[in-house]
């Protein structure tokens, strides 16, 4: 039993003989370092106790002990002897305890200095959603929420609402007083005669009466006059819409005569195509009733020759374009289409525009004399067959 060496696993000289450990000088441990054993060891050291080769290893192993169940981080000086399962002795000598107390005081001073350097953050109580949803930059809202959330201040919401209601009422009363003072009616200043005669008080009263009647009040609401006091005239268009009230029968008749009568629907008709059997005399008698816009819109020379109003539906071109069903520009003596195709541009006689022509005459008009082929029929849209 005595031959087994006392092996200390925390010793850096583990596995060596005891003689080599005894021959080495024993450095004196500092007072604030305690050996990693469960029993108290005197500072002077003994042969059987744990001995260290240098103070560097002792400090390192005391700060970070490799004990089972101990913390992996280095322990502070004020935590030694208080952490469980760290291998530090709970019972220490008086010198070690005094050193630990000095270190504790020093660490407390350092913590106080760090707290003074760091800004202080106060933890506020949790706030309701209504405060976050409200207007943060509204000082009245913040004051209202703070006074409701603080538990020490008992604030009555009804009293606050009553005070606000009284303030609003007082403000409304002041505004009404200002409005009544500003809307006070004064006689209209006459710029042509700035110094009116004081001998006609009746005329001044008559001038002030329409101003008073125009502005009426409904439940404290002062209506603005529709028209200026200088004019006092209603437009004629509005006068026609307003029904006459308190008028004598003779005045009502005069008002009705002044109002324009509605247009009669059955008298006027749109000018259209006349029947084919109607004579020129009947059409000439109806020409004064036709509005001027229709005659002015027609720029064709047929209006001068026939004396009939020409509209877009009744406008007719040359007989060649009508037979070919082409649009005619109605230029005389030859239209543009007939000139381009070198066709015979024939115009109907006045008064015979709507009459049907016999088939032989139509064929004669649609045929031309060709130099090589003789008399041929003109086809629509074909330009190859041309006359001289």
Swiss-Prot record:
Family matches, as CDD domains: GAL4 (cd00067)
Coiled coil: none
DNA-binding region ranges: 318-345
Basic residues biased stretches: 268-278
Region (Disordered) location: 1-120, 157-219, 236-311, 348-367
InterPro entries: Zn2-C6_fun-type_DNA-bd_sf, Zn2Cys6_DnaBD
Tree of life domain: Eukaryota
Comp. bias (Polar residues): 1-19, 52-67, 88-97, 173-203, 282-294
A GO molecular function held by the record: DNA-binding transcription factor activity, RNA polymerase II-specific
Gene Ontology cellular component list: nucleus
Biased composition (Basic and acidic residues): 351-367
Keywords: DNA-binding, Metal-binding, Nucleus, Transcription, Transcription regulation, Zinc
Location(s), subcellular: Nucleus
Record keyword Phosphoprotein present: no
Main location per the UniProt record: nucleus
Keyword Metal-binding: yes
One protein family per Pfam: Zn_clus
Ranges of biased composition (kind: Low complexity): 20-38, 102-120, 157-172, 204-217, 236-259
Known function: Perhaps a regulatory role. May be involved in transcriptional activation.
Protein name as annotated: Zinc finger protein 1
Source organism: Candida albicans (strain WO-1) (Yeast)
Gene: CZF1
């Amino acid at each position: 039993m005595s031959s087994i060496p006392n092996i200390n696993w925390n010793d850096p000289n583990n596995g060596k003989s005891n003689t080599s450990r005894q021959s080495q000088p024993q450095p004196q441990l500092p007072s604030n370092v305690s050996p990693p054993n469960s029993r108290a060891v005197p500072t002077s050291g003994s042969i059987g106790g744990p001995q260290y080769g240098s103070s560097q290893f002792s400090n390192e192993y005391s700060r970070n002990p490799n004990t089972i169940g101990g913390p992996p981080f280095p322990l502070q000086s004020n935590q030694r002897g208080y952490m469980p399962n760290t291998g530090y002795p709970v019972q220490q000598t008086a010198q070690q305890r005094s050193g630990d107390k000095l270190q504790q005081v020093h660490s407390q001073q350092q913590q106080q200095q760090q707290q003074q350097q760091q800004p202080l953050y106060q933890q506020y109580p949790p706030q309701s959603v209504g405060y976050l949803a409200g207007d943060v930059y509204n000082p009245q809202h913040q004051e209202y929420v703070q006074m409701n959330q603080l538990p020490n201040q008992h604030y009555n919401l009804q009293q606050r609402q009553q005070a606000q209601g009284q303030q609003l009422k007082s403000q409304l009363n002041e505004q009404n007083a200002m409005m009544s003072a500003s809307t006070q009616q004064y006689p209209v200043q006459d710029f042509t005669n700035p110094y009116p005669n004081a001998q006609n008080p009746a005329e001044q009263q008559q001038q002030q009466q329409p101003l008073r009647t125009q502005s009426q009040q409904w439940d404290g609401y002062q209506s603005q006059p529709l028209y200026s006091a200088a004019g006092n005239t209603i437009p004629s268009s509005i006068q026609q819409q307003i029904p006459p009230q308190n008028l004598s029968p003779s005045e009502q008749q005069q008002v009705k005569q002044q109002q324009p009568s509605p247009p009669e629907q059955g008298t006027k008709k749109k000018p259209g195509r006349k029947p084919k059997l109607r004579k020129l005399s009947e059409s000439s008698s109806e020409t004064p009733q036709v509005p001027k816009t229709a005659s002015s819109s027609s720029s064709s020379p047929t209006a001068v020759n026939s004396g009939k109003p020409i509209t877009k539906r009744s406008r007719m071109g040359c007989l060649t374009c009508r037979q070919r069903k082409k649009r005619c520009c109605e230029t005389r003596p030859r239209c543009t289409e007939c000139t381009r195709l070198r066709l015979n541009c024939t115009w109907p006689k006045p008064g015979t525009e709507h009459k049907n022509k016999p088939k032989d005459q139509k064929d004669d008009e649609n045929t031309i004399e060709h130099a090589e082929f003789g008399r041929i029929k003109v086809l629509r849209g074909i330009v190859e067959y041309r006359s001289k």
